[in-house]
Amino acid sequence: SVIFGADDKFLNLFARMQKLAPFIPLAGAHSQFQPVWVEDVALAVVKSLEGQGFRRVIEACGPEVYTLKQLVQLAGNASGIPGGRPVLPLPDWVGQLQALVMEHLPGGPLMSRDNLASMRVANVATSLPGLSSLGIQPAALSAIAPTYLGPDKPMQRNDDLRARKR
């Protein structure tokens, strides 16, 4: 599933977008994700290299399932926008058009048609062993995200200063 952490390009992007836009047009708004903390993934890699998970498939997922819309709202709320900005779920054909346009923007695509297609399948745990099989209790996004997205965090303060400069 999606990996989140202090320098991620996922929740931080959604938090920044909400500082600039009055609403968020969102393709794939109802897609499901089970975000996992980068530190839990790193620990799983270490434990696997030490032999605990060697030659096994481990599903690296956090304990909570969200829709993309809920993740966008959580990012906004955690960054100091109560409830986050309104999210406008886009119909599939508009989402495809949005992704096509984003593929051609400078700086790497925020979303591609391939990303959108992959979101049609839920990015959540199945019956395979998870992080707990390595003795790892996955951290909840709802507990970790506010520690790095909050309005008093360095990255957020820089964004606030840039917004005031405009």
Model-derived features: positions:
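Conserved donor sugar-nucleotide recognition element shared by glycan-biosynthetic enzymes
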Residues: 7-11, 34, 68
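Low-complexity, charge- and small-residue-enriched intrinsically disordered regions
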Residues: 22-38, 102-126
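Short, hinge-like loop/turn segments at secondary-structure boundaries
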Residues: 13-18, 104-106
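A conserved pocket-lining segment of Rossmann-fold NAD(P)-dependent short-chain dehydrogenase/reductase
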Residues: 16-36, 40, 44-61
